[in-house]
């Protein structure tokens, strides 16, 4: 159950939301942050998506409306659903006294899902926005690690997540940006209201990023409200 706003402000936020593009450092930051807190859980949006065993639809650049940037079709439905589910899990943890750290891109319909589920709660909202050059280099550097992960997880090269990864490998071979969805996410971040703490972690090591988040958590605090929908 959500406590009163004044009580939440006194106690501090029990939910963190860390968003940004792929390779922005969300997962690494969240895991390190969780270890620095006395009782904390990491709720990863991608893991919510992976709960869909059959019919899973990972978004690709062609799924985005060129005008609004919103995802269309089943990809959009599943994207909004995974963030909704991540926020529901985070709320359950928070109500049990466990700090929850949610990570996902959290733009457009995903941000609306967050508003719907976490409205009236105090959240530490963080946007990680490294430079585009850093994002692209990290995308290339992560390919071997992701290949090993997917090989261990799936025995089917036609699995949607494996197929999406194969597209990024081909992009690297062609000299194109590894994550072509990056531009869509960046435009979505531009449409977010300027709430919480926005940080360019380019050139920072992960521990320093966490130090900064803890030192500046008051700047990240945001009382979630429906009047703050993205532009």
Per-region residue spans from a language model:
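Walker A/P-loop
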Residues: 27
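Glycine-rich phosphate-binding loop used to anchor ATP phosphates in small-molecule kinases
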Residues: 77-122
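ATP-binding Walker
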Residues: 24
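Conserved substrate/cofactor phosphate-moiety recognition/catalytic segment
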Residues: 31-87
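P-loop (Walker A) phosphate-binding loop of NTP-binding proteins
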Residues: 21
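Conserved phosphate-donor/acceptor-positioning beta-strand/loop module used by diverse small-molecule
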Residues: 104, 119-142
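Hydrophobic anchor at the beta1->P-loop junction of P-loop NTPases
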Residues: 18
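Small-molecule kinase domains that catalyze NTP-dependent phosphoryl transfer to phosphate-bearing small molecules
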Residues: 145-209, 225-231
């Amino acid at each position: 159950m959500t406590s009163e706003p004044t009580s939440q402000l006194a106690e501090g936020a029990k939910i963190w939301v860390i968003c940004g593009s792929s390779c922005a450092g969300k997962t690494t930051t969240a895991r390190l942050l969780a270890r620095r807190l006395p009782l904390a859980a990491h709720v990863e949006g991608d893991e919510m998506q992976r709960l869909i065993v059959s019919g899973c639809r990972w978004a690709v650049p062609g799924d985005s409306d060129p005008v609004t940037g919103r995802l269309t079709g089943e990809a959009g439905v599943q994207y909004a659903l995974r963030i909704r589910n991540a926020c529901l899990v985070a709320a359950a943890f928070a109500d049990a006294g466990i700090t929850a750290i949610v990570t996902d891109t959290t733009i457009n319909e995903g941000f609306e899902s967050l508003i719907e589920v976490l409205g009236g709660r105090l959240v530490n909202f963080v946007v990680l926005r490294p430079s585009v050059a850093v994002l692209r280099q990290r995308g290339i550097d992560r390919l071997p690690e992701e290949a090993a992960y997917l090989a261990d997880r799936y025995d089917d090269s036609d699995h949607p997540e494996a197929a999406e990864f194969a597209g990024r490998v081909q992009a690297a071979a062609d000299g194109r940006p590894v994550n072509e969805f990056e531009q869509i996410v960046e435009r979505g971040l531009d449409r977010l209201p300027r709430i919480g703490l926005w940080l360019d972690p380019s050139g920072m090591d992960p521990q320093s990023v966490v130090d900064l988040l803890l030192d500046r958590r008051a700047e990240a605090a945001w009382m979630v409200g429906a009047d703050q929908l993205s532009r």
